[in-house]
């Protein structure tokens, strides 16, 4: 199976401690590049998440986000930071002494950030639940990349089949093209009233045939089509291999176009270049 680099997956998590939503999305990228948007208290998960992605993906710009809402504990214990409370009181007393007026309000002390805090939930347990959910999400994400990859595979294979048809068409036309060019050259000699030695004429014909012969280009096109098909069948991370094959196919189609002396063959060469470009666009999406 081949895999697309473009995909999206989402997973909702509902636990006793609250709710969370994981999302993964990816777009084309030459290499593997990961980005994370995590709540501050769970940033410590980033290295573990990065390793999970590295083990399962090879290319793409991957964005992972986590939104979480923990439930407030009805019977949560309150922790008083006595040291901080004492510092706040001393500061307020100093301000009062400097101002010469005002009273120290106990409510203001208790509202100061960090003086009174509810006991936090077990972050380790929550983190483990989140990692387990991420594994499930990653499985769905990879499956989606695979489904998208199969669609791209079908499109590319259709273009390869069309290239094979055009290649066979040109091959079948070549004997007639060579005969037409031979007759055309002889007619020129005759119109110019040149009395050439038959052996010299035959040599010119051979040289002409060699210049316009595209058998090697057609053979290589056919070979590249087969190799590209084999790469698709093997599956895996095929993007770079297929990109190289497109360069080879494009090189042969350019040579075919440069040797063309017939409108039909020129049209086939143009069609080949269109088909190759269509495949190249799809291959940019493959891992």
Swiss-Prot record:
It comes from the Bacteria. GO terms for molecular function: RNA endonuclease activity, producing 5'-phosphomonoesters. Keywords: Endonuclease, Hydrolase, Nuclease. It holds the Pfam family YicC-like_C. Its cofactor is a divalent metal cation. Belongs to the YicC/YloC family. Probably a ssRNA endonuclease. Might contribute to small RNA (sRNA) regulation. This is Probable endoribonuclease YicC. It comes from Haemophilus influenzae (strain ATCC 51907 / DSM 11121 / KW20 / Rd).
